[in-house]
Design a protein with these regions (language model features):
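Short linear motifs embedded in intrinsically disordered, charge-biased segments
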Residues: 3-298
Length: 298
């Protein structure tokens, strides 16, 4: 990719830029205390051979895709046209186009939803989309019923079964939760799924009080019996540790710049922000959170 980026500069291909403002308390270089701000090119995002390129217009997208394929060809590789997809984020057109670019006379599919590294991305949902939550729930439930003979076997101690649940099922339910920006409805679905599994594992978990629809065991009581962590608490803890880790990273780190994103948002309503969500839950100011993160108090 280093060769591709160098060639992109020579061909004047422009990638998407994003603004950032790192608070002074989080600046770890010699400019500590002065703040750090600017723009950064999102020239590429990738893991192994799974690459993401971001452009502001179709012209640069087309040039970048052709140049990427040319660069790979020079090294005995090529772009897999069948697996390559495009997506228009926040598309304002009423009719979402099925394709917007070609490569070697083959149309590249333009999708509304794409799965990248196990997570679903939706073209017009700035926060964690419902497709991602549906996928997480389906994945967790499939694993739960796959192991149902063990997880719902009362002859096995509950503590052992809960440990198996958290290790093999909850890990699927909360996969990549460190970067989630959920609304209250989505969080309730995650919690409901987890407690529904606990009810199946605990004897008389679905028993109701006489003449009412109320369960004998509330969710809180289920948690006490199982001696496990509430899913909301688990997700919050994961996000707090992740954000604190990013705060301690070098100021040049792209993750740190993305965490303190300062792009203008023109969409009405509350702007989803992992940084604001985490600091808001800790009941402390952003500066206090940064100081605790640097001191590794989290």
């Amino acid at each position: 990719m280093r060769v591709f980026i160098q060639r992109s500069k020579r061909h004047h291909i422009k990638f998407t830029k994003t603004r950032y403002t790192i608070p002074g308390a989080a600046v770890l270089t010699q400019r500590h205390g002065l703040g750090n701000y600017g723009t950064v090119d999102l020239d590429w995002i990738g893991y192994a051979d799974d690459l993401v390129l971001a452009f502001d217009d179709i012209e640069n997208l087309s040039k970048g895709l052709v140049l990427l394929n040319t660069t790979l060809t020079d090294y005995g590789m090529q772009v897999n046209v069948g697996k390559t997809k495009t997506m228009i984020l926040n598309c304002k057109e009423e009719n979402y186009p099925s394709t917007i670019v070609d490569l070697e006379n083959v149309s590249i599919e333009n999708v509304k939803v794409f799965q990248y590294l196990g997570s679903y991305i939706h073209f017009n949902q700035a926060n964690t989309g419902d497709e991602e939550i549906n996928m997480r729930i389906d994945s967790a439930e499939c694993k739960f019923y796959e192991m149902g003979k063990k997880l719902m076997n009362y002859k096995i101690s509950l503590s052992t079964r809960v440990m198996m649940l958290n290790s093999l099922v909850r890990s699927r339910l909360t996969y990549a939760c460190q970067t989630w920006t959920l609304n209250s409805r989505q969080m309730e679905r995650i919690c409901s799924t987890y407690f529904g599994m606990l009810r199946k594992m605990i004897r008389n978990g679905y028993k109701r009080e006489r003449d009412t629809y109320r369960y004998v065991y509330s969710n809180q009581r289920l948690q006490e019996i199982a001696k496990t962590e509430h899913p909301c608490s688990f997700i919050n803890r994961q996000q707090r540790s992740f954000v604190a880790h990013i705060v301690r990273r070098d100021d040049k780190c792209i993750l740190k710049k993305a965490l303190f994103n300062a792009d203008e948002v023109h969409i009405p309503g509350r702007t989803p922000s992992l940084w604001k969500n985490v600091t808001g839950r800790e009941n402390c100011s952003e500066i206090e959170f940064i100081r605790k993160a640097i001191a590794k108090d989290f």
